[in-house]
Amino acid sequence: MPLDRGGPTMARLKLATYNVNGIKSRLDKLLEWLGRESPDIVCLQELKAEDTGFPRKALRDAGYGAVFVGQKSWNGVAILAKDADPIEVRRGLPGDDKDTQGRYIEAAVDGLLVACLYLPNGNPQPGPKFDYKLAWFERLIRHAATLQKSGHAVVLAGDYNVIPTDLDIYNTRSWLKDALLQPASRECYRRLLAQGWTDSIRALHPDERIYTFWDYFRQHWEHNSGLRIDHLLLNETLAPRLVSAGVDTWVRGRPGASDHAPTWIVLDDAPRKAVRKRAPARKVAKRAPARRAKA
């Protein structure tokens, strides 16, 4: 049963993370989603565009300011804010001055410190790509410990490229050799949570199979053969404000869509005492049958 927060209705903030898988080629899908769902803050991954190719004007026309780190053909992350300009705090994950990949950015938005990340995939493993993934994860763990103790309300949002538990995958059999499912990857995620970070989806939907990614191959979307690899982690200062969480799966059903769907949370503007309450159906994101989603 989902958790909701009691008390009077207050101003709320909707924050989402979305691996857009090419911002130029899928700009129309992004703008459609922004117009329909109207999130206040958005973390984007896999822009696959240099800074000069970032669609700043189109997003500004849609009502969103942005900070971003681009990279030609690969990676790239951005933070969007509705009717505001995010204030960039950090560009790049600390710990390796030689790492120039566009995978991490931090910004101050609406009283929050928002960190947007695109963790390395790590395939094939074993090998140098998997070694880089684990080294990057270690750097994230060290930096996250600093953020946890900063006193600020912090969210670590993005594509983590890790499947935390077997509940987060349709079937482990086909993924046993994949970097996303390796014990070392899962252990890094567990260590991150052990610092006191709250996995938003699991905090509110502890027993439900919720996916954020469906591979393009073998009709994974049509068969709902998904993974949950896009996560929004809240530090101890911010977690008490969590109200609801879900996935906008309708976006994945659009022709030519990214293989990810936007994952979102709603925050109160002040902490609320948690009470158990049956949530309205709209608060639990369910994937519509593929034949309807593609209509």
PLM regions and their residue ranges:
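Structured beta-strand-rich core segments of catalytic domains in phosphoester-bond hydrolases
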Residues: 47-50, 54-124
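Active-site-proximal beta-strand elements of phosphoester/diester hydrolases
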Residues: 12-21, 111-126, 157
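N-terminal, active-site-proximal structural segment of metallo-dependent hydrolase catalytic domains
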Residues: 2-61, 74-77, 272-295
